């Protein structure tokens, strides 16, 4: 028979209320007592009655808040697909997902959305955090007040999240540089386009790219680095500027969304396929460009799986009392025309 909270309380010589606090990760219990109760529960293979809890919450759902960056990036649209898939799967267990889409990459907007979700009484939150001290402070304040917060896609030191879901973007940048080095002249000249310096994932990709080039391909030259905020129109403008300004442009490295803008500019400048193109995220447009040879390779990060994992992780923590591992890493997937 499954062990009960009453039995654990008797063996630990504490009240059932104390055991309930420990198993539901609530404050008000001494560390030594908490450790003792957890050890007993583990030895007895205690399994929480999450179905009973879910039946209660089906009448009063647990609300989860998810904050996404603007959806003009197809990667975000795929994230949303994964979130919606998970919401459909877990709604029967008393989960309601509130998804908020940012319209810019400005910290003030993200802070406003965080406050909206707090007002909506969410019990857990998944945030694609901007690299801003006020954002860090607000998120950490929520965590200190017992809200379950996970971050995704951009990992930022100093945020004390429940866990991080996403890719090692520094590794992704190094992978891009290594692949480019293998298919290019040793002194190739590169134009770089990143989304925003407010997103650590793009900074990490850039740093990984630069470090790998410095270590293994020291004669490669980065001509310029500009932001496009994930907008294809800005990617188009920046790429055309690179083509006009740098006659020896040999490659474009795009860490962000906007691949259609890059390819359109190269076609107008009659630089494609001579200029090599490396990008991140496997979208329908990227697949089309890989197949026709205008993109050399792309690095994927399974956004549908990532979006699903956000809801699943918060569900398991809040309903099943399963604490996630500190980092749920999404592997770097190298895609070429031959692997499609």
Language-model segments: which ranges?
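N-terminal helix-turn-helix DNA-binding module of bacterial transcription factors
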Residues: 1-54
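N-terminal helix-turn-helix/winged-helix DNA-binding helices
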Residues: 42-74
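Short, solvent-exposed amphipathic alpha-helices that sit
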Residues: 75-90, 172-176, 200-219, 238, ...
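Short beta-strand elements in bilobed, periplasmic/extracellular small-molecule ligand-binding domains
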Residues: 88-107, 190-192, 213-233
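Hydrophobic alpha-helical
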Residues: 124-141, 209, 227-285
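Flexible loop/hinge segments that line or gate small-molecule binding clefts
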Residues: 133-171, 283-291
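Hydrophobic alpha-helical segments within soluble ligand-binding/sensing domains
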Residues: 164-189, 235-236, 286, 302-319
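Hinge/cleft segment of the Venus flytrap/periplasmic-binding protein
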Residues: 201, 213, 302-340
């Amino acid at each position: 028979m499954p062990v009960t909270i009453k039995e654990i309380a008797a063996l630990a010589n504490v009240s059932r209320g104390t055991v309930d606090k420990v198993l539901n990760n609530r404050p008000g219990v001494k560390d030594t007592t908490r450790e003792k109760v957890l050890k007993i529960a583990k030895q007895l293979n205690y399994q929480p009655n999450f179905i009973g809890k879910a039946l209660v919450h089906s009448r009063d759902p647990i609300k989860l808040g998810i904050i996404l960056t603007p959806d003009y990036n197809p990667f975000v649209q795929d994230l949303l697909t994964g979130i919606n898939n998970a919401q459909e799967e877990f709604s029967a267990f008393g989960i309601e997902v509130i998804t908020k889409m940012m319209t810019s990459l400005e910290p003030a907007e993200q802070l406003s959305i965080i406050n909206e979700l707090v007002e909506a009484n969410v019990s857990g939150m998944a945030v694609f955090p901007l690299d801003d001290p006020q954002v860090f402070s607000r998120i950490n304040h929520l965590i200190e007040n017992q809200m379950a917060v996970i971050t995704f896609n951009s990992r930022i030191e100093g945020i004390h999240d429940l866990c991080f879901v996403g890719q090692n973007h520094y590794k992704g940048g190094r992978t891009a540089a290594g692949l480019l080095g293998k298919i290019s002249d040793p002194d190739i000249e590169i134009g770089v386009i990143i989304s925003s310096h407010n997103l650590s994932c793009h900074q990490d990709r850039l740093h990984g790219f630069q470090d790998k080039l410095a270590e293994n391909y020291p004669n490669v030259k980065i001509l310029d680095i500009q932001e496009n905020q994930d907008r294809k129109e800005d990617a188009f403008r920046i790429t055309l500027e690179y083509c006009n300004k740098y006659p020896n442009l040999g490659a474009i490295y795009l860490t962000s969304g906007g691949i259609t803008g890059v390819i359109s500019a190269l076609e107008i400048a009659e630089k494609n396929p001579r200029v090599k193109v490396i990008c991140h995220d496997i979208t329908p447009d990227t697949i089309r460009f890989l197949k026709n040879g205008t993109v050399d390779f792309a690095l994927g990060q399974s956004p549908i799986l990532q979006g699903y994992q956000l809801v699943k992780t918060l569900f398991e923590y809040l309903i099943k009392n399963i604490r996630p591992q500190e980092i749920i890493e999404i592997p770097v997937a190298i895609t070429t025309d031959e692997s499609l």
